[in-house]
């Protein structure tokens, strides 16, 4: 496997704008020190219920669900159809709210992520990229910074250009439109936008969906390098077993309306449950397990 070293240049975004949740009592230049103090829970989910109503009928998706995600992990959420994987991801981002229970992100209620400056705390890569079709590449990447309305245009463009190159795209791509991009380039632009304010937490919804094998491998290599070099905590939803085993340090399995196991990949595969047996030990799972045996991953 090719090892990619990502160059993380000095940021052009003031710390007090970029990261208010991590260390609100620290001055400029100190906000990111909190990442290296000691191990901590980045996401905590406690007694979570998600109930959808359709007329007189109720569908319980999550019931008393508990989960903790520690700093520095790459945790993957897997489960069958209807187990609420993406719903849980959106709840962590504050885009949806549980029926009851608590989700805290970086020590604060996830519901507050909808407020100004959320991009400095959590970055989100949506499944199809979710780029604005009327914006150029550089305008898409810069969008979260422009929404702050606190930085001059030249600083915003400089920060966006840094992230454009950090995800492996050339400066020539800056003025292209989304309609001119390949699927792999769309993913990279969306990733650059998710990272524009250096958030400590990155959420990925099917990051390699729609990519050919070569593009998928290249994108996984990029994600692993960014996770390492930017000291990210990553939460990922994926159905792709190759991506799952290549990136995950832990896997949380959703079944029976809860997390039935949250552990390292080898322990999860050995856990006795019908979904796990079908998902991991079928022909596709066996092929992906070869990758795990070849590349034993550590943080």
What do the predicted segments below correspond to?
Residues 109-123, 147, 153-154, 268-271:
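ABC ATPase NBD coupling module
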Residues 202-205:
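Catalytic Walker B motif of ABC-type/P-loop ATPase nucleotide-binding domains
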Residues 177-181, 185:
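Conserved ABC ATPase signature
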Residues 93:
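Helix-to-loop junction immediately C-terminal to a conserved catalytic motif
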